[in-house]
Amino acid sequence: MHLIKLDKGSLKIDDKIEVNVNKEKRERTEAHHSATHLVHAALKRVLGDHVKQKGSLVDEHKLRFDFSHDESLSDKEISKIEDLVNQEILKNSAVSTKIMDLEDAKNSGAESLFGEKYEDQVRVLSIGEDDFSLELCGGTHISRTGDLGIFIITSQSSVASGIRRIEALSGP
C-alpha cells in the first residue's frame, strides 16, 4: 500500500515528490510474499496438482493463501507442508527473476494464475533448489530463502465450496 501525505497544495503529472519507504515493513511484506510462493509449491507436492491459487494477502504481519482443495488439511499434511517450506528456507537458496516471453515461460513450467491477463514479456520468479517454486510474478521478494526465517501455519479454514485458506507466519 502506498500512502501520499501532502503538506500543502496538490499533485499533478510530472511533479517531483519525495518517497519514504518503511524498510522494515517492506522487508516483512516481501518475506511473506516470497513465502506464499513456497507454500503454493509445497501444497501441490503434498496435496496434488489440482491445487491452484485462488487468492492471497500478504502484509508485514502474516500471509494468507487461498487454494482449491475440497477437504480440511490433516495435521500430518500441515506438518508436511511446513517441513517442505522450512527445508527450502534452511537451504538458503537464491531467489531469482528473469524476463521471458510468455510462451517460453509457460513451456518452462512456470505457474500462472488462471484468468490473469499477461503481457508478451513476463517476469518469472524462481525460488529454491531445482526451481522448487517457478511462477510468473511481478512483486518484490527476498534475495535468499534463508531470509524468511522459520515458517509456521497458524490456521486453516474453508472460505467457499472447494476453497481452503491457510494463514501463516514467516520470520525470525
Where on the chain are the PLM-derived regions?
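A glycine- and charged-residue-rich anion-binding loop/surface
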Residues: M1-P172
